[in-house]
């Protein structure tokens, strides 16, 4: 009985994986084109955001962070996953352009490059942090 149930599940999983359709892009080249369009939009928006939100960064630092965020997902090759990341990136861009994000929300992207806080007692002691 259990073997029949697992066989049925495997058949259903196989059928589901073959019937999954891409979100927007038909192939990886089209997905890459969408990524480049999103990257260009972010690249053009950085000076406006830095000026409008009076950020404590330069335009070059903002553009470098945009590049870093895009390169973080450069290994992704599945067009469906790429499309999903592009959709999320467009939502972030729209929130930034329409100033639905506040200054602190944008500056949170720049705290990832800080050194992580020490975890063990001696490292905390040497750094001057409370245990």
Curated annotation (Swiss-Prot):
GO terms for biological process: aerobic respiration; mitochondrial respiratory chain complex I assembly; proton motive force-driven mitochondrial ATP synthesis. It is found in: Mitochondrion inner membrane. CDD domains: Complex1_LYR_NDUFA6_LYRM6. It holds the Pfam family Complex1_LYR_2. Transmembrane segments: none annotated. Its main location: mitochondrion. Signal peptide: none annotated. Keywords: Electron transport, Membrane, Mitochondrion, Mitochondrion inner membrane, Respiratory chain, Transport. It is a peripheral membrane protein. GO terms for cellular component: mitochondrial inner membrane; mitochondrion; respiratory chain complex I. Mammalian complex I is composed of 45 different subunits. Accessory subunit of the mitochondrial membrane respiratory chain NADH dehydrogenase (Complex I), that is believed to be not involved in catalysis. Required for proper complex I assembly. Complex I functions in the transfer of electrons from NADH to the respiratory chain. The immediate electron acceptor for the enzyme is believed to be ubiquinone. Belongs to the complex I LYR family. This is NADH dehydrogenase [ubiquinone] 1 alpha subcomplex subunit 6. The gene is Ndufa6.
């Amino acid at each position: 009985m259990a073997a029949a149930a697992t066989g049925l599940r495997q058949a259903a999983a196989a059928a589901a994986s073959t019937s999954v359709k891409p979100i927007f892009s038909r192939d990886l080249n089209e997905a890459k084109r969408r990524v480049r369009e999103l990257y260009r939009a972010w690249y053009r928006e950085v000076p406006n955001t830095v000026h409008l939100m009076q950020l404590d960064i330069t335009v070059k630092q903002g553009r470098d962070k945009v590049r870093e965020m895009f390169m973080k997902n450069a290994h992704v090759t599945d067009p469906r996953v790429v499309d999903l990341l592009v959709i999320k990136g467009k939502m972030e861009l729209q929130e930034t352009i329409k100033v639905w994000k506040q200054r602190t929300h944008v500056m949170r992207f720049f705290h990832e490059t800080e050194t992580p806080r020490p975890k063990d007692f001696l490292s905390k002691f040497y750094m001057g942090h409370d245990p």
